[in-house]
């Protein structure tokens, strides 16, 4: 069984505006500890990098997968902190195998996330896009829907599988936490 420990962030200055605009209970999730806020009206990546650094001290993080089209500065900063960062494509080639595996593991009840409401909401927002060859990848049908956490889970699952965690035990017992 794979144990998932998700973390999510939102800018604190516009959380109320986002609640009204998106009709999503970000404020409730923040009060319940399922969503973290960062100072200002945009996500403060320095805060997240520090958070990841602290996780690295607590867990044995082997590597961090990232979308190579949007995380150049954070990737460089995390490398500077000593983390191994691995580029991960968002197309069918890279996303299809772990997406299919996540679907299989979910049906087998081998993914545990403790009922995390933010991750559950993002998973519910996924629309599975299929190419002519039968490859699949996550997509979203509406621009207001968020699927970032679901995509991060798929990327982390791929890295966990490639890391050789096939014994059915907790991934944390073998190699620590993957953070994306």
Where does each model-flagged region fall?
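RNase H-like, metal-dependent nuclease domains and their acidic two-metal-ion catalytic environment used
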Residues: 1-90, 96, 100, 113-180
């Amino acid at each position: 069984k794979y144990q998932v420990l998700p973390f999510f962030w939102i800018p604190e200055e516009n959380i109320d505006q986002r609640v009204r605009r998106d009709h999503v209970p970000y404020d409730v999730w923040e009060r319940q500890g399922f969503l973290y806020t960062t100072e200002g009206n945009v996500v403060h990546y320095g805060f997240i990098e520090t958070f990841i650094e602290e996780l690295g001290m607590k867990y044995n993080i082997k590597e961090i997968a990232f979308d190579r089209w949007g995380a150049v500065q954070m990737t460089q900063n995390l490398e500077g902190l000593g983390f191994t960062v691995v580029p991960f494509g968002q197309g069918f080639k890279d996303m299809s195998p772990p997406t299919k595996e996540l679907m299989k593991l979910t049906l087998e009840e081998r993914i545990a996330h403790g009922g995390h409401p933010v991750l559950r909401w993002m998973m519910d927002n996924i629309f599975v896009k299929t190419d002519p060859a039968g490859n699949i990848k996550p997509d979203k049908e509406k621009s207001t829907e968020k699927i970032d956490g679901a995509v991060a889970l798929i990327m982390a699952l791929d890295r966990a599988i490639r890391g050789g965690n096939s014994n059915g035990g907790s991934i944390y017992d073998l190699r620590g936490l993957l953070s994306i």
